[in-house]
């Protein structure tokens, strides 16, 4: 199709579009051929290096100096790895790395389909090239292209996934088997290196700052200090280690969990130890009469009022009344006696009003409880689910709001009708008054 020219009946726009499609198809074919060549070269290199025996260390102490202790811990415990990277561990991890001298320079993808295909195969948890620290003596040669990481993520290449998954878990035996100019020098930390890049499995914890910020991920603190730090000289200096280990005993309760200082129970119900612990720095506030009545039971409050306050006020009122009657019989009525009797009468009436309000509150509460008992349809099980209870109460509140809105609308409609009627009546009266004035003139 590429050798044939466009038919003469096509317009120039159609011919231009056809030429663009042919060019895109040719570029896609070239990219596919390059990917096939890369796959064949990698398979040949795997067959050559598969004969080199090596022994993988099984202890966290074999982590190279300057490596990531978190990576070694996750290597020994694969069940702690994220779900997106739980892949079978292959013995050919070190052998699947390709020498940069045999890697051809890949063309940049120009079509959106190829760009999405190449970028979609890369591991989402892999580190970008700028976050991997390496000494200057093992820098990769200039023949390695910058977009090698993108081209290695082509479909059908198992080495690309393992290369991004285990770059920081290679053991010292694998360093001796790698060739001097291979790509492994980009990921292995030498013993003389000071920087410690974080684990590839948790790149989100590595800040994009300088070398001091790449000492280790903070998400490995939950495993304990013994399982994430290698012994000896491979440990990080004290200036870059975490501030404190995971010790539940050292965690203090926040101040918000302590009882507030503004709300105090009555003296009869508060314990001395609780008040002393909560108000160690400040003097406890003395509860006034309103706070005491707020925390008391209404029934107990009525009982106390009847047994104490009502009796005392009644006795005081009778005493002042008898004194006033005696003074009246003697003919010497004192104004001070009248004031004391009035004060005693007011106190008695205040106690009676308080008892009336409290009993009214108790009765209204009992009515509301009887309504709520009808709301909960299932009263057989004592342990009701919180969600079911909230939904039932919410339905009751919604229905009550609907009824209240109906009353408000009715009252508002009647009020507006009365206002409009009065405005018309006033207007009619003003108009007839003007007519009467004109007739009189």
Swiss-Prot record:
The main location is: nucleus
Q: Which family does it belong to?
A: Belongs to the Mediator complex subunit 29 family.
Please list where the region (Disordered) is annotated. 1-294, 416-441
Q: Ranges of Polar residues compositional bias?
A: 98-107, 171-193, 230-250, 272-282
Listed Pro residues bias regions: 1-10
- InterPro entries in the record, alphabetically? Mediator/Homeobox_domain (IPR052145), Mediator_Med29_met (IPR021018)
A Gene Ontology annotation in the biological process aspect, one of them, is: positive regulation of Notch signaling pathway
Null allele phenotype: RNAi-mediated knockdown has no effect on seam cell division or differentiation, but in a sel-7 mutant background decreases number of seam cells. Partially suppresses the hermaphrodite gonadal development defect in a lin-12 mutant background.
Q: Where is the composition biased (Basic and acidic residues)?
A: 283-292, 427-441
**Protein name per UniProt:** Mediator of RNA polymerase II transcription subunit 29
- Give its localization: Nucleus
Name the gene for this chain. mdt-29
Organism of origin is Caenorhabditis elegans
Swiss-Prot/TrEMBL keywords = Activator, Nucleus, Transcription, Transcription regulation
Q: State the oligomer form and interacting partners.
A: Component of the Mediator complex. May interact with sel-7 and sel-8.
This protein's GO cellular component annotations are: mediator complex; nucleus
Its biological purpose is as follows:
Component of the Mediator complex, a coactivator involved in the regulated transcription of nearly all RNA polymerase II-dependent genes. Mediator functions as a bridge to convey information from gene-specific regulatory proteins to the basal RNA polymerase II transcription machinery. Mediator is recruited to promoters by direct interactions with regulatory proteins and serves as a scaffold for the assembly of a functional pre-initiation complex with RNA polymerase II and the general transcription factors. Involved in development of gonad and seam cells.
Q: Where is the composition biased (Low complexity)?
A: 13-52, 108-125, 132-146, 252-261
């Amino acid at each position: 199709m590429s050798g044939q020219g466009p038919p003469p009946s096509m317009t120039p726009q159609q011919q231009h579009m056809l030429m663009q499609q042919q060019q895109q198809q040719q570029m896609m074919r070239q990219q596919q051929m390059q990917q096939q060549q890369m796959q064949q070269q990698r398979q040949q290199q795997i067959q050559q290096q598969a004969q080199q025996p090596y022994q993988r260390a099984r202890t966290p102490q074999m982590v190279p100096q300057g490596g990531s202790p978190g990576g070694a811990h996750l290597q020994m415990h694969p069940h702690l790895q994220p779900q997106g990277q739980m892949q079978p561990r292959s013995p050919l991890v070190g052998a699947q790395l390709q020498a940069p001298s045999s890697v051809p320079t890949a063309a940049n993808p120009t079509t959106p389909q190829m760009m999405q295909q190449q970028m979609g195969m890369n591991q989402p948890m892999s580190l970008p090239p700028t976050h991997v620290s390496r000494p200057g003596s093992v820098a990769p040669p200039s023949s390695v292209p910058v977009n090698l990481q993108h081209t290695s993520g082509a479909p059908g290449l198992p080495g690309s996934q393992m290369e991004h998954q285990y770059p920081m878990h290679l053991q010292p035996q694998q360093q001796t088997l790698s060739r001097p100019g291979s790509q492994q020098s980009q990921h292995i930390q030498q013993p003389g290196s000071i920087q410690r890049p974080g684990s590839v499995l948790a790149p989100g914890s590595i800040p994009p700052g300088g070398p001091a910020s790449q000492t280790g991920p903070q998400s490995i603190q939950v495993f304990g200090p013994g399982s994430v730090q290698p012994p000896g000289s491979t440990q990080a200096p004290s200036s870059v280690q975490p501030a404190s280990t995971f010790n539940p005993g050292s965690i203090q309760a926040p101040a918000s969990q302590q009882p507030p200082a503004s709300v105090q129970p009555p003296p009869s119900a508060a314990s001395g130890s609780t008040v002393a612990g909560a108000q160690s720095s400040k003097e406890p506030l003395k509860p006034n009469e309103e706070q005491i009545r707020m925390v008391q039971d209404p029934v107990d409050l009525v009982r106390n009022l009847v047994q104490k306050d009502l009796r005392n006020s009644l006795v005081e009122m009778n005493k002042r009344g008898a004194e006033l009657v005696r003074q009246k019989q003697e003919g010497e009525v004192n104004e001070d006696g009248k004031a004391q009797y009035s004060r005693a009468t007011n106190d008695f009436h205040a106690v009676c009003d308080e008892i009336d309000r409290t009993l009214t509150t108790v009765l209204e509460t009992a009515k509301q409880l009887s309504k709520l008992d009808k709301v909960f349809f299932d009263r057989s099980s004592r342990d009701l689910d919180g969600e079911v209870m909230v939904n039932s109460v919410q339905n009751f509140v919604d229905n009550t709001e609907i009824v209240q809105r109906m009353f408000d609308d009715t009252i508002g409609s009647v009020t507006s009708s009365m206002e409009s009627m009065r405005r018309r009546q006033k207007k009619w009266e003003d108009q007839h008054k003007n007519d009467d004035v004109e007739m009189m003139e």
